[in-house]
Regions:
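Extracytoplasmic ligand-binding site segments that recognize negatively charged/polar headgroups
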Residues: 53-67, 79-97, 102-230, 234-237
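A bilobed periplasmic-binding-protein/Venus flytrap-type ligand-binding module shared by bacterial periplasmic
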Residues: 158-163, 201, 271-283, 294, ...
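Extracellular/periplasmic bilobal clamshell ligand-binding domains
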Residues: 319-355
Length: 355
């Protein structure tokens, strides 16, 4: 059981034995609960539980910073971080829930379609932090209150400025097909990374699978996480990255490293990262407190300033080095379509790239 990999089809089967106990039952939907403020009673109840488990697809240093900051703000409550790629987190939660194991309190994923699955399976507990209700746009909050967008970023092209002159650097996805870049490109994998799964869906939709077939002929170095391509071009193992997180490059540039961000002419995939509480959370009050902390202006500003993420919180200032989202051409995914096509995308990508 432990070694089994769960697909979205398995999740739907597992939902049949969820808390409802009704085969193929569709959970009843209700309006989102009223916004909840952080009160002394909530803090005290969370302290009595003493811990919270946070499953996260954010980079480990980001997830750990969130955990340690929360622990400093609320002494007596420890945070256990379980960090992995979004698709691995999805499989783990499916396995746990399908086995009747309630281990996760709060989960965030770089694949928004996961929340559609979890919501349909009735695994998410509606909870709306006060600041989400006040300061987040409606399109970044689930109407039923089961999740909201905790942060965002863009998947971009990038290059090592010691290896590629600015005037020669690719400006578009089409430019990556130039013969000069053969054997010089690195790319992340949609079978591991939820962000890259979303980006692959967008590129297949807008540029077509023939584009990806041509890109595969460029002798691309294949890595797992969307955070890996920036590391490879920094080390000079490859000159160009075909995808990867813009925030990694922004942070490296802040350190004076020889990398540059390219927002492709065709547009860059927007990656949103929802967060939600699980209905069977073993530490429900600590989960609520952590979720409210996650969406607070203070925490959101930290994610922007320290980790170069994007925030939809109305009171949070954009990082100075960032091109404002309003000035960028964004390629937005449809989570429901990603959900429906996920397994096909992974299989087709693996066949095309041979990995």
């Amino acid at each position: 059981m432990r070694d089994r990999k769960w697909s979205r089809r398995d999740v739907l089967k597992a939902s049949a034995v969820s808390a409802t106990g009704l085969l193929f039952a569709e959970p009843l939907r209700a309006a989102a609960p009223p916004p909840t403020a952080v009160t002394p009673d909530l803090i005290e109840a969370a302290r009595k539980e003493g811990k919270v488990s946070f499953y996260s697809a954010l980079e480990l240093n980001t997830a750990e910073r969130l955990a340690r900051t929360f622990e400093a703000k609320y002494p007596g409550i420890s945070v256990r971080v379980e960090r992995s790629g979004a698709e691995r987190i999805f499989q783990r939660i499916a396995q746990e829930q399908g086995s009747g194991i309630n281990a996760v309190d709060v989960a965030n994923s770089t694949d928004p379609s996961h929340y559609l699955e979890w919501k349909k399976s009735d695994w998410l507990q509606p909870y709306v932090p006060e600041e989400v209700a006040k300061y987040f746009p409606a399109d970044q909050v689930d109407p039923d209150g089961t999740h909201a967008t905790s942060c965002a970023w863009m998947e971009v092209i990038g290059y090592n400025t010691d290896l590629v002159k600015r005037e020669d650097a690719p400006k578009s996805y089409a430019d990556l097909l130039d013969a000069r870049w053969q054997g010089k490109i690195v790319k992340a994998h949609p079978g591991y990374s939820g962000a890259i799964l979303t980006a692959t869906f967008v590129l297949a939709r807008d540029l077509g699978w023939p584009y990806l077939e041509k890109l595969a002929q460029q002798k691309v170095m294949q890595v797992q996480s969307a955070a890996d391509p920036p590391k490879k071009i920094l080390l000079g193992e490859r000159a160009i990255m075909a995808d990867g997180n813009d925030y990694n490059l922004v942070l490296l540039k802040d350190q004076g490293k020889p990398v540059e961000v390219v927002y492709p002419a065709e547009g860059a995939p927007l990656i949103i990262v929802p967060s939600g509480i699980f209905r069977g959370a073993p530490n429900p009050n600590a989960a609520r407190l952590f979720q409210s902390f996650f969406f607070s202006a203070e925490t959101q500003q930290m994610l922007v300033d320290v980790f170069a993420h994007r925030s939809f919180h109305a009171q949070v200032r954009e990082k100075g080095e960032h091109i404002p989202l309003a000035n960028l051409k964004m390629l937005k995914a449809d989570p429901a379509a990603v959900q429906a096509q996920s397994e096909e995308i992974k299989a087709r990508y693996t066949k095309i790239f041979g990995v």
